[in-house]
């Protein structure tokens, strides 16, 4: 019984569950998608909130440049490159034996400074927003001051009386632990069994307390939440429900628009933009997709990619039960090499906010992630962690789908030929060489 209903009844009502339960790579193109002008109201946030977040990051830029010299060249703004991957595109055409029209680009959040993943957006933003609230409340800075002052000894001593806590499979904990420690906060990261050892080691090297669990992500989050409850000096970063995290990710879209403009890429109804986003609990891809919909409206098509063993958002939105159901309820084990996506229960906040804004959801098995990892390195010399490749199969999924999605969305052959597909590479820039070699060896063995 699942929520009081026999599994057979679930399968009768939601036939795509059979593929999810059997761990077969599958896709579902959302029949409930609505015009963005209408569906954006579901989110409960708007363009003014994203602009406020962007302005906050600008205020903190001098401090970031001072604390992290690798950001000095960008003036303390944490941003990633956008690169066309035409050789990889050709390799995918051969790999999938399909034409795959359009152009293929990679958004390299894998190589964001400070923590080497998309979590450097939302995670760092939330800690900065919390630090700003404390600093303004206690008179450490004013809104028009130079925030690099917060690196001074008296400010660090003040922050040291406060704690930041978070539950994580790895990358979110890495970004929050590093920025928290850099500001002087005490930081504790509750890490699930899926977290890679090198990420734990890196956090400890920054003076962060790492609490390890033999259980999965949801348990780590709950324990982190429990630690923070009732302690006015502890701020819990709630990956399942945080609006600050969500807004930190959403800022990426306005910057991407500038990068696309600089590259001469048009985005409109005749030149659609498809953005393929790896999804764990949903905050990162949800926030980015929200920002993209604000920036490009119905000309952008956002799709979430998940491991076959951890399809929590697909499951939650498809059934309409969101965080009420977990993959484990259906006998799916939530065990995947894509550690950043090893989440069994989705964010109900993100699922409900974005359920009429996303074009679809698809799953990818671990072996395919490793094949794509090796194929990208072989064709372009770019190295990513397995999680970051989840969206690389998306161009084939959209091109070959049999569900009438393209016709429903008016995606004619001419429009697909003019399309830009963007794979959001979410992490991998800090993977140790020995670990990366093992990833590549596994991928090459599966390809050859």
From Swiss-Prot:
GO BP annotations listed: D-serine catabolic process
Reaction catalysis annotation: D-serine = pyruvate + NH4(+)
GO MF annotations, alphabetized: D-serine ammonia-lyase activity; hydro-lyase activity; pyridoxal phosphate binding
Modified residues (N6-(pyridoxal phosphate)lysine): 119
InterPro entries cross-referenced by the UniProt entry: D_Ser_am_lyase, Ser/Thr_Dehydratase, Ser/Thr_deHydtase_PyrdxlP-BS, TrpB-like_PALP, TrpB-like_PALP_sf
PANTHER family: D-SERINE DEHYDRATASE, THREONINE DEHYDRATASE, MITOCHONDRIAL-RELATED
Assigned protein family: Belongs to the serine/threonine dehydratase family. DsdA subfamily.
Protein name: Probable D-serine dehydratase
Record gene name: dsdA
């Amino acid at each position: 019984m699942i929520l009081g209903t026999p599994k057979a009844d679930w399968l009768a009502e939601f036939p795509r569950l059979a593929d999810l339960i059997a761990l077969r790579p599958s896709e579902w193109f959302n029949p409930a998608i609505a015009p963005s002008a209408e569906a954006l109201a579901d989110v409960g946030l708007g363009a003014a909130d994203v602009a406020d977040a962007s302005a906050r990051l600008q205020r903190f830029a001098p401090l970031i440049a001072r604390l992290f010299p690798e950001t000095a060249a960008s003036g303390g703004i944490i941003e990633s490159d956008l690169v066309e991957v035409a050789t990889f595109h050709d390799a995918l055409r051969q790999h999938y034996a399909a034409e795959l029209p359009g152009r293929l680009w990679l958004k390299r959040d894998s190589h964001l400074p400070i923590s080497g993943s998309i979590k450097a957006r939302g995670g760092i933003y939330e800690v900065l927003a919390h630090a700003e609230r404390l600093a303004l409340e206690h008179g450490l800075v004013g809104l028009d001051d130079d925030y690099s002052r917060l690196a001074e000894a008296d400010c660090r001593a003040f922050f040291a009386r406060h704690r930041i806590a978070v539950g994580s499979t790895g990358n979110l904990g890495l970004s929050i632990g590093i920025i928290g420690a850099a500001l002087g906060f005490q930081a504790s990261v509750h890490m699930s069994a899926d977290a890679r050892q090198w990420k734990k080691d890196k956090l400890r090297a920054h003076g962060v307390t790492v609490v390890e669990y033999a259980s999965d992500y949801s348990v780590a989050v709950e324990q982190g939440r429990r630690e923070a409850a009732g302690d006015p000096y502890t701020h819990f970063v709630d990956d399942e429900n945080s609006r600050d995290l969500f807004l930190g990710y959403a800022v990426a879209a306005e910057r991407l628009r500038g990068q696309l403009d600089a590259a001469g890429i048009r985005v409109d109804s005749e030149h659609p933009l498809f953005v393929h986003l790896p999804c764990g609990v949903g905050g990162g891809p949800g926030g980015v997709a929200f920002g993209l919909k604000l920036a490009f409206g119905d000309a952008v098509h956002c799709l979430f990619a998940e491991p076959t063993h951890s399809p929590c958002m697909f499951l939650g939105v498809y059934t309409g039960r969101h965080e009420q159901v977990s993959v484990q309820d259906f006998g799916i084990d939530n065990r995947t090499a894509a550690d950043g996506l090893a989440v069994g229960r989705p964010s109900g906040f993100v699922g409900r906010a974005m359920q009429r804004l996303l074009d679809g959801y698809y799953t990818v098995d671990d072996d395919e992630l490793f094949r794509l990892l090796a194929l990208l390195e072989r064709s372009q010399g770019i190295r990513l962690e397995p999680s970051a490749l989840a969206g690389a199969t998306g161009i084939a999924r959209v091109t070959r789908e049999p569900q009438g999605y393209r016709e429903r969305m008016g995606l004619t052959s001419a429009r697909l030929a003019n399309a830009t597909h963007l794979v959001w590479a979410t992490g991998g820039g800090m993977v140790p060489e020995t670990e990366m070699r093992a990833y590549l060896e596994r991928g090459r063995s599966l390809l050859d």
